[in-house]
């Protein structure tokens, strides 16, 4: 039996909106597998569509560079927001981004080796760990970029207006699409969601045959919600991104989105515990 920690229960609550006891029970039944717990809770009606896992806890910056026919995003992490704004840290991060631009296709391993000496020296000077975490390239006829406070970086590749593609990049930053078009959603993802929706319908009392017919309509909505062109455009929710792109004669071929610290869980202590540690328990 996997250990059901308080942080795991907290994450499940944040992602489903369900109560603490329901979340703990679901995790116990799923042996600590949070994704399985979410699926089971959705099937039983305890949770609606769960929020995507995207715990942003680590600090740092996302930097973007655009070259001839390609763009690159680089993520560099540190431990605190204070250091993320430090001139030395930002200087090194910009050096890394410039190197990635000048050496298209470079790997994260190459970047780490190239800048290890400077990184180690900066760690010794500042007294805080830091690392180059990710580098991602995107090829395209036209590349647009959008950075949201150096915490979220988006590159959009396409054909047509750079200005319009930048608006789409802003949409990607806000709405987190996973695919470009509804038809790009993989069969595996569609089937996984279909089975969940069928179980939800059956658990609500619908016969299996009727449940399966009901779900087909829901699947079209689902693929639209997770794809860029199927989503409502944040700058004009009355139309989809796809319809907007057609109206401005612009096409999106691909995109990438990085957010600082995605998937990294930062250990947090409550205020009382922190005070106790500082005072040696003599608060």
Curated annotation (Swiss-Prot):
Name the InterPro entries for this protein. EF-Ts_dimer_sf (IPR036402), Transl_elong_EFTs/EF1B (IPR001816), Transl_elong_EFTs/EF1B_dimer (IPR014039), Transl_elong_Ts_CS (IPR018101), UBA-like_sf (IPR009060)
Concerning SUPFAM superfamilies, the annotation shows: Elongation factor Ts (EF-Ts), dimerisation domain (SSF54713), UBA-like (SSF46934)
Which cysteines are disulphide-bonded? none
Matches recorded under Pfam families: EF_TS (PF00889)
Report if keyword Calcium is assigned.
Answer: no
Subcellular location field: Cytoplasm
Q: What is its main location?
A: cytoplasm
Q: What family does the Swiss-Prot or TrEMBL record give for this protein?
A: Belongs to the EF-Ts family.
**Region Involved in Mg(2+) ion dislocation from EF-Tu: which residues?**
80-83
Describe the function of this protein: Associates with the EF-Tu.GDP complex and induces the exchange of GDP to GTP. It remains bound to the aminoacyl-tRNA.EF-Tu.GTP complex up to the GTP hydrolysis stage on the ribosome.
Return the protein name.
Answer: Elongation factor Ts
Task: Recite the UniProt keywords alphabetically.
Answer: Cytoplasm, Elongation factor, Protein biosynthesis
According to its UniProt entry, this protein's organism is: Actinobacillus pleuropneumoniae serotype 3 (strain JL03)
An example of a GO molecular function for this protein is:
translation elongation factor activity
PANTHER family given for it?
ELONGATION FACTOR TS, ELONGATION FACTOR TS, MITOCHONDRIAL
Write out the GO cellular component annotations.
cytoplasm
């Amino acid at each position: 039996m996997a250990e059901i920690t308080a942080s795991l229960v907290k994450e499940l609550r944040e992602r489903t909106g369900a109560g603490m006891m329901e979340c703990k029970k679901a995790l116990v039944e799923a042996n600590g597998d949070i994704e399985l717990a979410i699926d089971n809770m959705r099937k039983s009606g305890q949770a609606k569509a769960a929020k995507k896992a995207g715990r942003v806890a680590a600090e740092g910056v996302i930097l973007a560079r655009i070259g001839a026919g390609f763009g690159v995003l680089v993520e560099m992490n540190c431990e605190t927001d204070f250091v993320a704004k430090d001139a030395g840290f930002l200087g090194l991060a910009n050096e890394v981004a410039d190197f990635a631009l000048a050496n298209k296709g470079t790997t994260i391993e190459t970047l780490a080796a190239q800048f290890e000496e400077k990184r180690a020296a900066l760690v010794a000077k500042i007294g805080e760990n830091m690392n180059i975490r990710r580098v991602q390239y995107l090829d395209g006829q036209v590349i647009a970029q959008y950075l949201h406070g150096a915490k979220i970086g988006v590159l959009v590749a396409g054909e047509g207006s750079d200005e319009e593609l930048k608006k789409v990049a802003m949409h990607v930053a806000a709405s987190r699409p996973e695919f470009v078009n509804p038809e790009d959603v993989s069969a595996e993802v569609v089937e996984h969601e279909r089975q969940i929706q069928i179980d939800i319908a059956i658990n609500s009392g619908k016969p299996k045959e009727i449940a399966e017919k009901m779900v087909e309509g829901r699947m079209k909505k689902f693929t639209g919600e997770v794809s860029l062109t199927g989503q409502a455009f944040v700058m004009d929710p009355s139309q989809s991104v796809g319809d907007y792109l057609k109206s401005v004669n612009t096409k999106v071929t691909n995109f990438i989105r990085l957010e600082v610290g995605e998937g990294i869980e930062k250990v947090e202590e409550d205020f009382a515990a922190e005070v106790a540690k500082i005072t040696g328990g003599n608060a």
